[in-house]
Amino acid sequence: MARSFAQLARSAEKSSSSIAVPKEPLETAPLDIHTLGDDALRGDARRIGKVDERVRDLARDMLRSMYTASGIGLAAPQVGVHQQLLVIDLDFETPSTPPLVLINPEITTCSASVDTYEEGCLSIPGVYLDVVRPTAIQLSFRDEMGRPRTMKADGLMARCIQHEMDHLRGVLFVDRVTDAGGLKKELKDHGFLATDVRPITP
């Protein structure tokens, strides 16, 4: 049976295997985050075969880099690692709430209902635009210990997971923006090129 994010968080709080790191910005992030225009963002990520300490160390460094950049989600391809690994923390102001680590995530069900919400991305700093996505999802994944999990998510969590999972296929949120004029202006205003966008069909 699929569990909600809240249930997963409570389970992680009871577990000694949590990979949580201090939710504080560092003077220098351990990993560089690639930005729009870098080829590193456009490849397909590989599934992770063995979940070991190396994977957990990467997840920790991703979290440290994410907190340093004041983000709520980060995918491994954004730091130049083409593996199917995501870290998410929507409650970064609460130290006791563990982050969510998703390894080899697969969305199994999407809601028929969709909503529109403004998105941003650590790989396109300063740019915020509306994107349409399914309101709710169900997914399967492995946690930081390699255990198989399922969960349901809606609202911001569902959107964040979908956004980060796009990175595993070389897709950026700007590829989904339908307001071409607004997109071009936002990108130009923040030093990015519209030619680096690869529009996809919603």
Curated annotation (Swiss-Prot):
Active site (UniProt): E164
Pfam families named among the record's database cross-references: Pep_deformylase (PF01327)
EC number: 3.5.1.88
GO terms of biological process kind: co-translational protein modification; translation
Enzyme class: hydrolase
Residues binding Fe cation, per UniProt: C121, H163, H167
Cofactor note: Binds 1 Fe(2+) ion.
UniProt cross-references to SUPFAM superfamilies, sorted A to Z: Peptide deformylase (SSF56420)
Highest taxon, organism lineage: Bacteria
Reaction(s) this enzyme catalyzes, per UniProt: N-terminal N-formyl-L-methionyl-[peptide] + H2O = N-terminal L-methionyl-[peptide] + formate
Known cofactor(s): Fe(2+)
GO molecular function: metal ion binding; peptide deformylase activity
Role played: Removes the formyl group from the N-terminal Met of newly synthesized proteins. Requires at least a dipeptide for an efficient rate of reaction. N-terminal L-methionine is a prerequisite for activity but the enzyme has broad specificity at other positions.
Family the UniProt entry places it in: Belongs to the polypeptide deformylase family.
Alphabetized HAMAP family for the sequence: Pep_deformylase
Protein name: Peptide deformylase
Gene: def
